[in-house]
Amino acid sequence: MDKKTLYHIVEWAVALAACAFLGYKLVTFEDYPALWESLRSMAWQQYLALGLCVALMPVNMAIEAWRWRTLWNGDATLNGANGEANELTDERLTFKEAHRQVYYSKLAGVITPWRLGEYPARGVLLTNERMNELGSERIWPRVLAMGAVGSATMTFAIVLAGVPAIMANGEWLMANGEWWIAVGVILLLLVVGLALAPRLLRQYAEVSYGLIIKSVGQSLVRLICWCVQLALVLWALEAFSFQPSAISSLFIYYLLVTITPNVPIAEVGVRGAWAIVVFGSVNAAFAGVLLWVINTLLPCLGWFFFRKK
């Protein structure tokens, strides 16, 4: 069996495993009657808000594709494992390729803790499609290096926005010193890691501080898109008002979800539990479920439409 066939098998194995897991989550969800009752009693304006949230899903995915393409194409060379530089010509990712890889990576994300499988999944698809041009020994070091940078910059953006939000509107957390210790440790590790990234990763990829700053900016754009989606779903379920304190709670919610240890089987429950804590409404838990369907389930299904024939 050649490498390309092996990667093709892995590609479909991940897709089928993710579909099985998503099906399990849908079948075992126990609150369909209450969720249906909440949806059935909504006015047309609330349905419109849900529709806008769904419409923002492809925008969200396009932002992540933009972010991933920027990371991969961030400099003029593609370094191999032995450190030699190779000029990039046709080896740059197109937006279409990055877009397809981002959709596929959602499948791996739902079956791995903290969605750690997303960037390796992009490597699987990239290797499957570009094996002849690049070779797996040149793709994987860069995928893993840029994946580490991408994960760190996204987390840094969430912490960067979430900490001021807590300080402005998080009295219930301000009194809890353990949360501040956890957030402080995470922030310190992120700052140190990103500061050292150009030196630590130079054998595998050219990572500049300019690229890191650009990725943080793109991550903030994606976070804002998430917050708008969450606000729309919460408002549709009568669990949100567009007040400054409520808006800051959106950033607090994503910070808490991000720093909470999580496994795939408990992800929906964790998101729902934090939604109740932050927004103070049982309907907020349903908002977390609906947003999971919109931003996780739909993109997973979307890969079957965007995949390369």
Kindly label every feature range from the protein language model:
Residues 118-127, 263-279:
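Re-entrant/interfacial helical elements at transmembrane boundaries that shape
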Residues 98, 102, 133-151:
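Alpha-helical membrane-spanning segments of integral membrane proteins, especially the hydrophobic core
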